[in-house]
Amino acid sequence: MNKISDTIIITSTSNEDEVDNNNNNNNLKEIDRSPRVNNNNNNILTNVNNNKNNTITSSGGSDSSSSSSNNNNNKIKKSKKHKEKEHMDSIVKLYSGKFDSWMVICHLFKYRDNPGIVDFLCNKMYNLEDKDIDFYITQLCILLINQPHDQKASFSSLARFILDRCASSFRFAIKAYWIFQAFEEDGEKNLFSIEGSVYLHSPSTSPKDVPMYSNDQIVPIDLDKIYNQSQYDDDDFDLSDDDGGFEIIKKNDHHYENDHHIENDPKKDINSNNNNNNNINNNNSNNDDNNNNEILPNENSDNSINDENNQYGNSNNNNNISGENDNIKIDINSQNKSDSNIETLNSTLCEETKTSPIKDDMENNNNNNNNNNNNNNNNNNNNNINNNNINNNNINNNNNINYGHINGSLSTLDGIGQPYISQPNDPIENITQILKRNRIIYKKVEEKKELATRLREFCEMSVITCSRPLITRPRTSSLPSPLISYNSGKIGGNYHKILSPSSVDSTSLISEDDKIIEKEEEDNVVEDDDDDEVNSEDFIPTATTTATTTTTTIPNHLSKTTSGVGINSNSSTPININSAGAGAGGGGEINHIGYDDISYLDKCKTPPAESKLSDHDFEFELSKSHRCDYLNDILSFIQKLAHISKILLPIPIDLRQAKLKHEISLLNINLPLGLYVPLWQSSNHHCVVRIPPEEVKILNSRERVPFLLVLEVIESEHEALSSNIFEVVSSYLQYTTGNSALKKDDIKRKYYSEKFKKSFLNSSINSTISNSSDSCTTETTTTSPVATSPTLPINIPHSKLINDGSNSISKSLPVTPTQSTVLNNLISTSTAISPPSQQQQLPSPSNTTTTTTTTTTNTNNTTTTTTTTTTTLSTSPTNEKILNENKQNSSPFGESWQEKIERYKKISPFGDYPNWRLYSVIVKTGDDCRQEQMAVQLISKFDEIWKETRLPLYLRPYSILVTSSGGGIIETIPDTMSLHNLKKSTPGFTTLLNYFKSTYGDPSGLRFRTAQSNFIESMAAYSIVTYILQIKDRHNGNILIDKEGHIVHIDFGFILSNSPGNISFESAPFKLTQELVDVMGGIQSGQFQYFKVLCVRGLIEARKQVDKIISLIEIMMSGPKMSCFVGGKEVIEQLKARFFLDVNERECSTLVENLISYSIDHFKTRYYDKYQSWLNGIYQ
């Protein structure tokens, strides 16, 4: 051979081979110290070995101990496998007895890097109760998103379990969908923040040029364009993307003034090409004339290696350093745009192992190269550059450049070589590292976002097909591929539209017996666990944006038009399933398909059991279309509520209430059938049938516009399962059996009668006057509903067409008389929803100001008209009784929740239904509700612990439904009032103790003592929770009291480590003012001693199960970024310290009593109440 190779392949089979290898390495060291000349006597030393597992690659100048290192590695691997087996055996033994959902979630997080344990635990979760799994749905989604291998996360057993739960539980599926959507929105926001950081740290960008983005201005971006922008060419810093790498150019003033790029110099190019060819052959030679070398990829060399076979070899191995007086150019071509290489690159940055995966790939590629001129292209060439070129003064060092920094820059990106050595006061180096770090972070965030999108789409398909979708495409199928017509939609707070899945392959379903471990599928998906390259096309569904409408020809008896209004039974009409028909249009109109005929409900109840048949089942395809539309209706409804909150923000405060009523009235008119909101604890399905506009209310907020809604729902006796969802929806109609036709006429007559209109207004006049800024006149109340409602003439022909069409359908279809009459009854009842709320002249967005102005100027006339109307409408005995009951209720709480339920049950068109219910919710938009959801989840765990130990401590958790990264729906607590409103609304209020005396009677009586005990038990419970979780912002607006005397805390925006204004003003462990102590009877009373005992016992029992609290918080810390985790790992350490784990129970009792003594009437607590009173007007 003509040249001495830098890479020597050594294969050892015995101790004698080791000695020979050591001698060969010593000879190689001597050769490297001598001048590099062509020496045919020094050839590559290769010992043939039949054992391929012991083959290693070593660099010139490095000692080799192949057998010993291999033996050590084998011992380490065996010890790891032994430990994993011990862990597995201990877990199997642990789970052989009793286990619960918390144990599974905790061990899933602890052993998340062990696939075997994860598979075992996921199989165990199939045996748990659904309610226990649903409680930890957020943690399960976080564990899935944060799995070690992002691209393989959708293959994992955890993903299969979640998708199986989505296929079986409609409630679980919708919640999981919104959680993954929130992760997707988080990724989009993070990508924009990284882009802003790139612009901010660029020398060519001034602060005024940094783009400001809002949540509504989110568009897809490509970070590669940032690095290809020409604006960097005119500055002291240049960063361009060349096959995924960086090019950093530092220019002197001469080149900057001439505005001439270095690469445009022809002399420079000639020298570069010549030196590049020379330096490949003589990379470590002592040539003093080589003063113009550059670090460039070996593109011009005749002996260059193919980029596809050696992607990293050219960038890392053919690096030649040039020392030039004026110009230094560094070209780092280190990464490829393929996902597999990005994953490999990111894995090197973790520095978990000393050997880089990139290094192994390059060694394998170089080992297969027999070209003698390419022997210098190995991954250890960087060491030769540092040790030979630099140390032997082969480069002109007049520039005083630290070449360790140059090599550090290479190693920072590639994960190879020496760490980065930062130079003080060097802005170029700092910017370089920031941009490199941002690029790597950008890629990782983008992968997380894509994974969240993929999982969200899988949740959609699980609901629509009632089974877990296949991750890989079917081997042989005559039907289209799964999800071929799906579209992921627009991101960034906008609604993700789901297209009708008429082309979804029926073979994409999996039977119920198929749980997790599918050997055949795993073999098809991943052939080699060590292979980091995963083809995304194998499991990412194909999304097409053009196929938005699917046309299917159906028989005559099932034909209907595109809009779902007209029904034609004479001819075969195609069904056009349009993606725009899900209600994303303006004006709050929500169109739905397939719910106007009871026959469609029958056809869509349950998919066929033979879901894997190759025949194209039309009924099953039609059911999938209806499921898609049903899911669209629910998502569109929630999105519309969030949109209402946004459009109220720019409106003046005094006009918001009228505008909110108007928007809710429009939404109420077009309310689709069977809307399901999975907010409450019950797993049974329910149907939202009406939203009374007169009960809506704007809540106090300085920056957002949250509002309160009252929902009329009909609960079902069945669970919200994906397979029987339409059976449940159709079961709501069975409550109107028996003389259905007569009942339909009675409802119509009742609706159009003057008596019903007067009754409705009479019962709701009080709430209308208090909540609305616009008044109701006599002329408005006596006007016909058809004349007052602008949208009613559209709804009436709609019902007529359906009624007429249903008669023809009943003749051609084998529908029972009960079903057909029930359908007509439902339609007439649905039409009867809107006119009562429209009897008031609702102001349009254009004339809102005019209406309010008229109301303000004519205050006296309005009052007189309202009084007259009340007197006129109070003729009915029933309505007069209701009004008298409202007047007699002089409690500061006003009308109780049960009284309101009875009142609406009498006047609601759906009040005759046996399972009719009334709920109230708060819609929040613009705030991330996930932190508050976590706080309520922790409170639920405390409540569970104390109930198990039978401690009389009272906590009132409430439900929070996260619908996006910036919004949610919150359950309200009925019959409660904040201490602020209690003091404000109670005439002559003095102290809380006097209120208890006036409300519950004599302090020695049973009612007072019961209310006092409720107050003490709730105060003790929330005092412990407030201290453990460090809940701040405890003013009287965030503390509620109910009619029974319980204290309830709400609004957990500041917990663990954050506080209002980032100022730790509330330094007391919990709020215990003198006013609260007086209700307990004073410090020396026996009731206050009872309070102390409850606090001590509560903390002692809680610290016995501290792992349930700690593990939940640790999992949440690995999820979305929340302000309560700004303290990092110290949050967990401080949380453990507050449980007093290092002391016994006696010492713990003393510490708790000290906390109570310290909190009594603390001066900072009083000052914070004064501050809130001065700033926000909250009563002290």
UniProtKB/Swiss-Prot annotation:
GO molecular function per UniProt: 1-phosphatidylinositol 4-kinase activity; ATP binding
GO biological process: aggregation involved in sorocarp development; chemotaxis to cAMP; phosphatidylinositol phosphate biosynthetic process; phosphatidylinositol-mediated signaling; response to Gram-positive bacterium
E.C. no: 2.7.1.67
Residue spans of biased composition, Basic and acidic residues class: 257-270
PIK helical domain: residues covered: 1-206
EC category name: transferase
Disulfide bond residue pairs: none
Positions with biased composition (Low complexity): 38-74, 271-325, 364-391, 768-793, 835-879
Domain PI3K/PI4K catalytic: 895-1164
Keywords linked to the UniProt accession: ATP-binding, Kinase, Nucleotide-binding, Transferase
Region (Activation loop): 1049-1073
Coiled coil region boundaries: none
Region Disordered, residue ranges: 15-84, 257-327, 355-391, 768-799, 832-894
Entry-linked InterPro entries: ARM-type_fold, Kinase-like_dom_sf, PI3/4_kinase_cat_dom, PI3/4_kinase_cat_sf, PI3/4_kinase_CS, PI3K_accessory_dom, PI3K_accessory_sf, PI4KB-PIK1_PIK
Keyword Nucleotide-binding in record: yes
Annotated segments matching region G-loop: 901-907
Basic residues compositional bias, start-end: 75-84
Domain of life: Eukaryota
Annotated Gene Ontology cellular component terms: cytoplasm; membrane; membrane raft
Family that this chain belongs to: Belongs to the PI3/PI4-kinase family. Type III PI4K subfamily.
Job of this protein: Acts on phosphatidylinositol (PtdIns) in the first committed step in the production of the second messenger inositol-1,4,5,-trisphosphate.
Protein name, UniProt field: Phosphatidylinositol 4-kinase
